[in-house]
Regions:
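Residues within the helices of the helix-turn-helix
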Residues: 12, 53
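Short, Lys/Arg-enriched anionic-surface-contact patches
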Residues: 16-38
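Short, amphipathic alpha-helical "recognition" segments used to contact nucleic acids or chromatin
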Residues: 34-50
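DNA major-groove recognition helix of helix-turn-helix
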Residues: 46, 70, 74-77
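Short alpha-helical "recognition helix" segments of helix-turn-helix
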Residues: 54-58
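Helix-turn-helix DNA-binding helix
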Residues: 65-67
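Short Lys/Arg-enriched helix C-cap and helix-to-coil transition segments
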Residues: 76-96
Length: 96
């Protein structure tokens, strides 16, 4: 699968699983559930061989924002049972 196809599929899967529109995930919206979904997309893309700069380019973020999301993902995961459940389901598909 091409990188562009992986990106689109991961984004669509996270959007479907979280019931948050992909446009909102890619926006600068700061609501907790949207930020969690954005971080999850970044985590899954990283696990599929994307570099932070590649993720940043595709998501319209700075590389620094992506690195911050990567370093803060475990803390968000530890504090959100809902995010953990969604992450487990999607990681089984995308990280296998």
């Amino acid at each position: 699968m091409k990188k562009s196809e992986i990106f689109a599929s991961v984004l669509a899967d996270v959007s479907a699983e979280t019931e948050i529109d992909s446009d909102r995930i890619l926006s600068s919206e700061r609501k907790e559930e949207v930020v969690d979904a954005r971080y999850l997309v970044i985590f899954l893309l990283l696990g599929n061989g994307f570099y932070p700069a590649m993720i940043a380019e595709r998501m319209g973020l700075s590389a620094r924002a992506v690195r911050s999301a990567i370093s803060g993902f475990e803390a968000r995961l530890a504090n959100s049972a809902g995010l953990r459940l969604v992450c487990q389901r999607l990681a089984a598909k995308w990280m296998a």
